[in-house]
């Protein structure tokens, strides 16, 4: 992930991994026509972005997305960001840094 590997490297990796897993599902004892993907924080963002890219490229369709507190906006001026931006594990300034390196 960023900053060492800027966007869209992480999205490209996720989509490639999904395509590989679906194409080789039988090898893993799974059904490639029935799969779910999910992630938390940046992983939630990558999950949603992967599903959208696969849709746009007529790729495999996930049956379920599990999006746990995904990072879906770079708007750091939202009331919830300002109200909860200090004293937590991820501060407002840290999130700005992450977004600037995405």
Label each region the model flagged.
Residues 1-102:
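Alpha/beta-hydrolase superfamily serine-hydrolase fold, recognizing
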């Amino acid at each position: 992930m960023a900053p060492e590997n800027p966007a869209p490297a992480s999205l490209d990796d996720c989509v490639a991994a999904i395509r590989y897993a679906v194409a080789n599902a039988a090898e893993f004892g799974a059904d490639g026509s029935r799969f779910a993907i999910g992630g938390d924080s940046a992983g939630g963002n990558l999950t949603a972005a992967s599903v959208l890219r696969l849709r746009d490229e007529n790729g495999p369709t996930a049956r379920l997305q599990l999006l746990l507190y995904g990072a879906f906006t770079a708007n750091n001026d939202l009331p919830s960001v300002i109200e909860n931006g200090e004293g937590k594990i991820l501060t407002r300034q840290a999130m700005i840094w992450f977004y600037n390196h995405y």
